């Protein structure tokens, strides 16, 4: 189905509607699964030696020093323009402001007299950030990951990226307080972070996007007892736009294409109650496509994308919640009025001037978001992902005495005799003291 095909949602059967909201298939082939498993085992067994072999094989690079030196990072900084450095500084300031505001106050309550319960937070001790390489280095992801890690107080923050690492990535790492950067990419980088090597430290949790091999490596290490936790399940990027008749077609088209250019497996969807808006957006997409260097990539993504006309804005919200987009852009008059009805979305952008690019780079929200329908159960990345919660309880003699019979009754009902005995022993001790 062509992206220029305008679909009337209410003329479709329930099955056709379900098909319209299906995402491009993603599944690691058996060969990818096996290859990644072999890489993990090899890196775990042979450490740095295996990393160097994989760099030569996959990156066509001979890596002498896996760890990037301070001199190399300083030199990279010198090569960047002041304009880019200033732009990064503005982005980091906004990311800091938003993520600092996410700090949770400690919980300290007395659930009944003499029974004190607390909840406190502690940072994840060590985290590893994976940043893909390639022709368009994702240095903005360094800002999005390293900044909350620093605010959370993670003691060890390291970064891996395929060699040669772009100057922008090295500077962003330094700017955000990353302690060590390593010349290693792909599934082998995930293995190094999960298991540790002579050079790369083992970390508790791994963050960051990547290709099918990286994604599969993260999945596998998260399921190994000796592996590491990961940030969230990954899938192709996506955006859904809700637009009314007052939206600007060129704005809508530019936001759709911003997502489509990410990759051929990206998906974009327009929902609008105005058929004329759908037609004008389709025309604007074609005009803007002609000017894009990544037009072919975007065009492939558009093959799995949709222009859907609905009954009204309420139905747009209903369909959006069913789909659960990574990015949801609401270009309607009084866009904020629709927010209370949104139940599943990674990040929401309100109004004509809240373009997705702002969230991707510099508004302050995090651009690491659940995709592929995981918005139903997962949240956008935030400070909490770099922290863990811990509870504390303290019972006084009086508090224990008041709760003792309740605990005994519950333990006896579950036939956990040792649990009940732990109470009874203390009750008897108090009687003896009296």
Curated annotation (Swiss-Prot):
Its pathway? Amino-acid biosynthesis; L-histidine biosynthesis; L-histidine from 5-phospho-alpha-D-ribose 1-diphosphate: step 9/9
Provide the cofactor list for this protein: Zn(2+)
The source's domain of life comes to Bacteria
One molecular function GO term is: histidinol dehydrogenase activity
The protein's assembly and partners:
Homodimer.
Q: Which PANTHER family match?
A: HISTIDINE BIOSYNTHESIS TRIFUNCTIONAL PROTEIN (PTHR21256:SF2), HISTIDINOL DEHYDROGENASE HDH (PTHR21256)
Name by which UniProt lists this protein: Histidinol dehydrogenase
Supply the source organism for this entry: Shigella boydii serotype 4 (strain Sb227)
């Amino acid at each position: 189905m062509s992206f220029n095909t305008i679909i009337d949602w209410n003329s479709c059967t329930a099955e056709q509607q379900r098909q319209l909201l299906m995402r491009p298939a993603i599944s690691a082939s058996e060969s990818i699964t096996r290859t990644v498993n072999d890489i993990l085992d090899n890196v775990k067994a042979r450490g740095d030696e295996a990393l160097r072999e994989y760099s030569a094989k996959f990156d066509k690079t001979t890596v002498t020093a896996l760890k990037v030196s301070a001199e190399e990072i300083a030199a990279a900084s010198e090569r960047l323009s002041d304009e880019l450095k200033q732009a990064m500084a503005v982005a980091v300031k906004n990311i800091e402001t938003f993520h600092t505001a996410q700090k949770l106050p400690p919980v300290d309550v007395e659930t009944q007299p003499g029974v004190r319960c607390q909840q406190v937070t502690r940072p994840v001790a060590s985290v590893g950030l994976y940043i893909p390489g390639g022709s368009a280095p994702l240095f903005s992801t360094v800002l999005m990951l390293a900044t909350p890690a620093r605010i959370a107080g993670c003691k060890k923050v390291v970064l891996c990226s395929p060699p040669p690492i772009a100057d922008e990535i090295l500077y962003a790492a330094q700017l955000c307080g990353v302690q060590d950067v390593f010349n290693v990419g792909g599934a082998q980088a995930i293995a190094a972070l999960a298991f540790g090597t002579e050079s790369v430290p083992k970390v508790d949790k791994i963050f960051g996007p990547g290709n099918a091999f990286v994604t599969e490596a993260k999945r596998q290490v998260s399921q190994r007892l000796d592996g590491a936790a990961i940030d969230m399940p990954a899938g192709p990027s996506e955006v859904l736009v809700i637009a009314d008749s007052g939206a600007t077609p060129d704005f809508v088209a530019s936001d759709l294409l911003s997502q489509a250019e990410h990759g051929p497996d990206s998906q974009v969807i327009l929902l609008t109650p105005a058929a004329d808006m759908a037609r004008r957006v389709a025309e604007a997409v074609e005009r803007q496509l002609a000017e894009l260097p990544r037009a072919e990539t975007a065009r492939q993504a558009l093959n799995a994308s949709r222009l859907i006309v609905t009954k009204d804005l309420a139905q747009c919200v209903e369909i959006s919640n069913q789909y659960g987009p990574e990015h949801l852009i609401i270009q309607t008059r009084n866009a904020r009025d629709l927010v209370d009805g949104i139940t599943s979305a990674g990040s929401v952008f309100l109004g004509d001037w809240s373009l997705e690019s702002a969230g991707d780079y510099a508004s302050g929200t995090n651009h690491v978001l659940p995709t592929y329908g995981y918005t139903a159960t997962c949240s956008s990345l935030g400070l909490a992902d770099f922290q863990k919660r811990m509870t504390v309880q303290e019972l006084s003699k009086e508090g224990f005495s008041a709760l003792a019979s309740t605990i005994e009754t519950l333990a006896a009902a579950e036939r956990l005799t040792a649990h009940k005995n732990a109470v009874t022993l203390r009750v008897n001790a108090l009687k003896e003291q009296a």
